[in-house]
From Swiss-Prot:
GO biological process terms on file: translation
Keywords: Ribonucleoprotein, Ribosomal protein
Source species: Anopheles gambiae
Protein name from the UniProt record: Small ribosomal subunit protein uS15
Gene behind the chain: RpS13
One Gene Ontology MF term: small ribosomal subunit rRNA binding
The organism's taxonomic lineage, starting at the top: Eukaryota, Metazoa, Ecdysozoa, Arthropoda, Hexapoda
Length: 151
């Protein structure tokens, strides 16, 4: 996938396995996977972190193939859905860290420019999530209150 603020076209992509059935060697049932997701979600992990742990520690390649639902949908059903989507959260976190850096290094012009790019990505993603009703329509990103969102 190509980058938004870079000249490269991007040819890298991941390929899902063709077989969509559960492997015969996998000992976890759908209910066990759901319990693991619930347990890891209560610890405060993001859906992608949960997926990585399930893949590396338990051998679950795709939660959707085992359970029929994605990690985020399972978390939503249990009531552990994050307040703001994961990708937006990490963009806000990055913007907050760059702002903190700029307080100490006022003359860092490149960081100022990168902050503008990151904040434009935040606004674009927030607009998308408002349309999809993931965020409330009155949600607004403000740099002054952003550190409270990611704390």
């Amino acid at each position: 996938m190509g980058r938004m603020h870079a000249p490269g076209k991007g040819i890298s992509k991941s390929a899902l396995p063709y077989r969509r059935s559960v492997p015969s060697w996998l000992k976890l049932s759908a209910e066990d996977v759901k319990e693991q997701i619930k347990k890891l979600g209560k610890k405060g992990m993001t859906p992608s972190q949960i997926g990585i742990i399930l893949r590396d520690s338990h051998g679950v390649a795709q939660v959707r193939f085992v359970n029929g639902n994605k990690v985020l949908r399972i978390m939503k059903a249990v009531g552990l859905k994050p307040d703001i989507p994961e990708d937006l959260y990490f963009l806000i976190k990055k913007a907050v860290s760059i702002r903190k850096h700029l307080e100490r290094n006022r003359k860092d012009i490149d960081s100022k420019f990168r902050l503008i790019l990151i904040e434009s990505r935040i606004h674009r993603l927030a607009r998308y999530y408002k349309i999809k009703a993931v965020l409330p329509p009155n949600w607004k990103y403000e740099s002054s209150t952003a550190s409270a969102l990611v704390a």
